[in-house]
Amino acid sequence: MANKFIEDIDYVVKKIEDELSQEEYRKILILRESLLKLYRERRVKINHSVMELICAKFLVQTGFNVELEHELNGISTDIYAKKGFGSLIVEVETGFVPPTHALDPVNYLRARITSKITRYSAFANKFILATTPYYIMQIPPSLVKPPRFRTEEEINYIKTLCDQYYSNPPVSIEEIRNARLHSIYVVDVDNASIREWEVNEYMGKAALWNV
């Protein structure tokens, strides 16, 4: 299986090579080595890793320095990127549901996405979710609003939702009050490309499938 992981990562690296400058490609090779190390430590899986790599390509091309599975204040972020004094975090969402949540997949995924936004968005200037074209994320509308427009009722709903699945440690009211999702990357793995969506535009389309 290790060889298959390497083959798949190298396939993506080769596929994007022609789109990159020499310096950008050098940065991608460093990230490749990082992913292989993480795989040997059993910390990553291939579906997630190829999406991280494609997101990294997009960020490297726009001038960011990128780290994968970056430890930040006791939490591990999928992608942490810096450019000048600016920083951003990207969390990759594949839509995977573990067997333990076979009977509540929608609520579980909604809580997972909500928890990511509330926990991570405070640690960078910009917080982004990355997902695939075939998975429609269930994002609470209250997290799309500017924080100052979030009501106490909405804050309490988010708190209850997150605590139902993620209570170690629980998200704080302050984290919920200040959380913000800035944009969404839709990752086309087949073509190793990304389309960046404005959050309200994505939510408008996702509303057709919202349950």
Stretches with model-predicted labels:
Residues M1-L29, Y134-V211:
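Non-catalytic C-terminal interaction segments of nucleic acid-processing enzymes
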Residues A2, E7, K14-H70:
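Acidic-basic catalytic patches of nuclease active cores, encompassing PD-(D/E)XK
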Residues V44-I46, T77, K205-V211:
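Accessory terminal regions of nucleic-acid processing enzymes
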Residues V50, V106-K116, I155, Q164-S167:
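Well-ordered, non-membrane alpha-helical segments in soluble/globular domains
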Residues E67-L68, I89-E91, I128-T131:
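A structural signal for short, well-ordered beta-strand segments and their strand-loop junctions
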Residues N73-I75, R112-I113:
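Amphipathic coiled-coil/heptad-repeat helices and related helical stalk/stem segments
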Residues T77-P98:
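Active-site beta-strand-loop-beta-strand hairpin of nuclease catalytic cores
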Residues T94-T151:
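Catalytic cores of nucleic-acid endonucleases
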